[in-house]
Amino acid sequence: MAAMSLLRRVSVTAVAALSGRPLGTRLGFGGFLTRGFPKAAAPVRHSGDHGKRLFVIRPSRFYDRRFLKLLRFYIALTGIPVAIFITLVNVFIGQAELAEIPEGYVPEHWEYYKHPISRWIARNFYDSPEKIYERTMAVLQIEAEKAELRVKELEVRKLMHVRGDGPWYYYETIDKELIDHSPKATPDN
């Protein structure tokens, strides 16, 4: 181990002697036992910055930046045409004006909206108030019928308990003439 260390020092000294550069402090024997590697001839510069540059480990911002770039792209992709469309609708079509309703004419539910885009959305995507009312009334009727059936079932159960009846009232009693007693008469056959 000591021989390898000495061999390394000798080789460093030989290379330094051949290259003409001096080594650090010499401890004798022509520099064979030096304690350092060749020193730099010029002072060390750290790229003109305010000190030594460090490699700081921090989380990647790649996905954050990519998300924000794509978000801006898709907002521009959809927002600009939507803004142009709304501007054109407001300029060329405009809002509806209040007018007298002719006799015998029943307005549709979307005709009560002022803006044309609101009218289009109400006509194509929303149900009419009459349809919503009828649907709600149907649900209320079904729930009322269920409540009435629950009350009747509770009354039937009370009467069954009072009279000692059981669930057999669901089935008709079989006629006794249809029962075959022959297997019981001769069980060994």
From Swiss-Prot:
Role description: Accessory subunit of the mitochondrial membrane respiratory chain NADH dehydrogenase (Complex I), that is believed not to be involved in catalysis. Complex I functions in the transfer of electrons from NADH to the respiratory chain. The immediate electron acceptor for the enzyme is believed to be ubiquinone.
Top-level taxon: Eukaryota
Q: Which GO terms describe its molecular function?
A: NADH dehydrogenase (ubiquinone) activity
What transmembrane ranges does the database entry give? Answer: 73-93
Q: What is this protein called?
A: NADH dehydrogenase [ubiquinone] 1 beta subcomplex subunit 5, mitochondrial
Q: Which family does it belong to?
A: Belongs to the complex I NDUFB5 subunit family.
One Pfam family this sequence matches: NDUF_B5
Q: Does the keyword Membrane apply?
A: yes
User: Which gene underlies this protein?
Assistant: NDUFB5
Question: Key word Membrane present in the record?
Answer: yes
| Disulfide bridge positions per record | none
**How does the record classify its membrane topology?**
Single-pass membrane protein
Could you tell me the keywords of this UniProt record?
Electron transport, Membrane, Mitochondrion, Mitochondrion inner membrane, Respiratory chain, Transit peptide, Transmembrane, Transmembrane helix, Transport
Q: Which GO terms describe its biological process?
A: aerobic respiration; mitochondrial electron transport, NADH to ubiquinone; proton motive force-driven mitochondrial ATP synthesis
Cross-referenced InterPro entries: NADH_UbQ_OxRdtase_B5_su
What is its subcellular localisation?
Answer: Mitochondrion inner membrane
